[in-house]
Each structure stands twice: as structure tokens, then as C-alpha cells.
Amino acid sequence: MKTTRYFREQVLRKRPYIQLEWCEKILAEPAAKMVQADGRIRFWGFVPELGWRALRVVTLADGETVHKAFPDRDFKPPTERVS
């Protein structure tokens, strides 16, 4: 897994509990995914070790270089609409 310098030097320093394995799993099997206006991609997944809280992993536009990761307390799983 590729990471940015910002992720290695800032994110992991601020949130040392974040495991790279969690990020890899979320990228491989996201619960949800969204492309931001700037081209970066948000991936969400649920982490048992965080009490099944949602973890947001943001990658660069390539979809594989991790730039940010943090617990996302505002994440709402997508709901299906019935027409």
C-alpha cells in the first residue's frame, strides 16, 4: 500500500492507533465509496477494534495512495430508496 508523506508524518502521529491493515482492508472491501470534487476518493469501512465505528480512508485520485484516515462519527450508511 502506498501512502503520502502527510499520512506518514502527520496522520499516524496524530492517530497512532490507526492500523495500516485496517486501511488496506477498507480499500479492498469498502462499505461505501465516493469521489470528492478534487478527485480524491473517500472509502468507508467498519473496524471491529474501534467498536465497529466507521473509518474514513481518503486516497489520492489514483485510488491506492492513502492520504488520510480517521474515525468518521458522521458517516451514515447509504440507504436504499424504494420507488
Where are the language model's segments positioned?
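Ribonuclease/tRNase effector modules and their secretory precursors
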Residues: 1-83
